[in-house]
Amino acid sequence: MASAGLQLLAFILALSGVSGVLTATLLPNWKVNVDVDSNIITAIVQLHGLWMDCTWYSTGMFSCALKHSILSLPIHVQAARATMVLACVLSALGICTSTVGMKCTRLGGDRETKSHASFAGGVCFMSAGISSLISTVWYTKEIIANFLDLTVPESNKHEPGGAIYIGFISAMLLFISGMIFCTSCIKRNPEARLDPPTQQPISNTQLENNSTHNLKDYV
């Protein structure tokens, strides 16, 4: 198993990734308006998230409206919702499992059980990172396609918001953390299997008895 320091580093990366994924899921700025229509004089910026749309006015007021209808949402928004929630669940499960499997903790019992728990936590972290990465990449692709579409008015074009960058960085942190946990278990198990079986040393009395029996065979 990897050293306790390396596992602790991976756990810190995982905690940062979990916090980032949860923050990105709840933030309303997955995309923001590039240019607000000139008729809306009081509006500064309009934000669009997975769960709500918000508008920030020049007066300092900030109003948000929840997206109650699920079927009316675009397919990439529905997919982003599902994959980000899945990433949050998997990363939380990975935190619980990897805590048991860490070398610096006294949970989990014997080394073999801790190794399996560490590997399971790493798989959860990697799966959560992939889920978050799918959400951010797909959502960004739709924003860029809409931005490059010449038929779309300038007022309806958007650019990626801060939540997408947070989600992308968090996905990388979770994936790296999962690789560390999984690699620590893969390196350990083959060494345990390749260890030669220990043989008890033969005493001098046994050697003398064996030699006596061999001499009697020739008499």
From Swiss-Prot:
Give compartment(s): Cell junction, Tight junction; Cell membrane
Question: MF terms per GO, please?
Answer: identical protein binding; structural molecule activity
The family annotation for this protein states: Belongs to the claudin family.
Name the chain's protein: Claudin-20
- GO BP term, example: calcium-independent cell-cell adhesion via plasma membrane cell-adhesion molecules
Disulfide connectivity for this sequence is none
Membrane topology reported for the UniProt record:
Multi-pass membrane protein
Topology, Cytoplasmic side = 1-7, 103-118, 182-219
Species of origin:
Homo sapiens
Entry keywords, A to Z: Cell junction, Cell membrane, Membrane, Tight junction, Transmembrane, Transmembrane helix
